[in-house]
């Protein structure tokens, strides 16, 4: 089977999983993607397919195909990268794939749990991504800090790096707020000074407080204090 035949076959399989109602709903959540490029596949179903497809030789061929035509093809690509257990190979495939991400959902789909075993060296790549000129690469870098470096891997320099980012991009700043809201739930005393000393732009500062107040992981006492830290525009 050549590459063109493989893509046709994969695409046929993807359309067999289509849910048009879900497509119409999901299209409203990812306005940066044209609706015509969304097939409409629920994530658990796509994950199951990716797990099966990842065991075949065709998956290696699929990873060589970039850019993709459909949103779900990009998501499938990301889910296949997640299955790679070799650090260098995984990083290499990420480098090829990240510039093609064009929406927050594909960006946030990638968890890369295997990177927990490589925290000491993976942080260097995260720093580099956060200095990118591409919004979704920056967002991805922040998401990796949030997923893998807020518990035993936490260092004070990490929130400093996120706070220092200056961007006009909504999807970058929303991830920054999400990072700090999650960090407050896990490292409250170490993160609180970023709000008390107003180390971020006003929008991200206030959005962090909003998301924290909405969180069940923040105590009522903490929420009451956070409310006093809102910046009035």
Q: PLM features: residue spans?
A:
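Alpha-helical scaffold domains
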Residues: 1-233
């Amino acid at each position: 089977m050549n590459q063109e035949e493989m893509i046709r076959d994969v695409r046929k399989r993807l359309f067999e999983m289509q849910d048009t109602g879900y497509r119409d709903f999901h299209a409203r959540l990812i306005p940066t993607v044209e609706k015509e490029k969304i097939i409409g596949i629920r994530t658990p179903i796509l994950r199951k397919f990716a797990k099966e497809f990842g065991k075949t030789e065709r998956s290696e061929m699929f990873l060589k195909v970039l850019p993709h035509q459909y949103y779900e093809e990009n998501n499938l690509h990301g889910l296949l990268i997640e299955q790679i257990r070799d650090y260098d190979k995984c990083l290499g495939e990420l480098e090829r794939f990240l510039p093609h991400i064009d929406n927050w959902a594909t960006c946030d789909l990638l968890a890369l749990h295997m990177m927990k075993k490589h925290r000491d060296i993976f942080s260097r790549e995260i720093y580099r991504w956060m200095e990118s000129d591409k919004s979704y690469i920056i967002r991805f870098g922040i998401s990796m800090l949030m997923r893998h470096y807020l518990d035993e891997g936490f260092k004070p320099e990490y929130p400093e790096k996120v706070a220092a980012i200056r961007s006009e991009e909504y999807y970058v700043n929303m991830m920054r707020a999400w990072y700090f809201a999650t960090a407050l739930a896990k490292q409250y005393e170490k993160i609180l000074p970023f709000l008390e000393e107003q180390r971020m732009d006003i929008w991200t500062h206030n959005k962090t407080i909003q998301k924290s107040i909405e969180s069940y992981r923040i105590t009522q006492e903490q929420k009451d204090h956070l409310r006093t830290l809102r910046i009035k525009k």
